[in-house]
Amino acid sequence: SNCSSLTNITVPDSVTVLDGLAFSYCTNLKNIELSKNLTEIGMGALSHCTSLETIDIPDSVIIMDNIAMAGCSELKSVNIGSNLKTVGGQVFAGCTSLEKVNVNLNNKNYTSENGIWYDKNKTKIILYPYNKKDSAYTTPTSLKELCNGYVGSYGILLDNSNLKTVTIEKNVAKIDDYAIGFVFDFDNYKINKVKDFTVKGYRGTVAESYAKKNSFNFVALDKTLQTPSISKLENTSGGIKISWNKVSGAYGYRVYQKTSNGWKRIKDTTATSYTDSAVSVNQTKTYT
């Protein structure tokens, strides 16, 4: 550690464990080729290598310990091998230039899509890169939660100031505090809210409640259905029969009657007609 003169190194294949802090604060290290037999990257082993821009995690690596690469501020891309299983806390904390994480397709524990690191079934995000350039993100339909990030820093899952809009699908059942719409200010060591942040989602879901709780813009994705038009009014032996056109996408209809106190709901139905039996001779009624 603290080898400021070190710029390039190849770790011999005889090395199976990279000890904690092994190359920490090697601030001029630009290239490192890890052992093909490496199984573990120890705590802080490659932390604060501030000149390192890319790294390949070999297929042999199973464990990346806490803060393994924290503070690698120029790191732009990470390639993760096929056998990584255990990932410690804040492994990439403070890697503020990181744009993409690519996971080997044969990895049974993790996957990646568009540079974002997920668990294998894409039910949760492992890491959304700090410096990914996209201004908008839509959660996969498989995603179940937006929980506080432990691989990144300080509990913020989508810690990216470029990100202004997140669209949340219906399957997301949980959003932790500060998970989205916030960024960590490393200079002043505090959490800031993203200006003009927008959450898109469905009414009555965690997306709407999270947006309202944090005073973010909320855009509802629920379909706006057409109001049915009354197609026929007729007198029948049972009363006045009201018929209307079927509206595509509607699962039911509500019939209202105008009263002296305003509109009164008189019927919920899945049919496209309703017969009002509460009528009398010379009576006028208004429906909608």
Mark where each language-model region is.
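Beta-strand-rich modules
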Residues: 276-288
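Extracellular low-complexity, O-glycosylation-prone stalks/linkers
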Residues: 249-265
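Hydrophobic core positions of the immunoglobulin-like beta-sandwich fold
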Residues: 244, 274-277
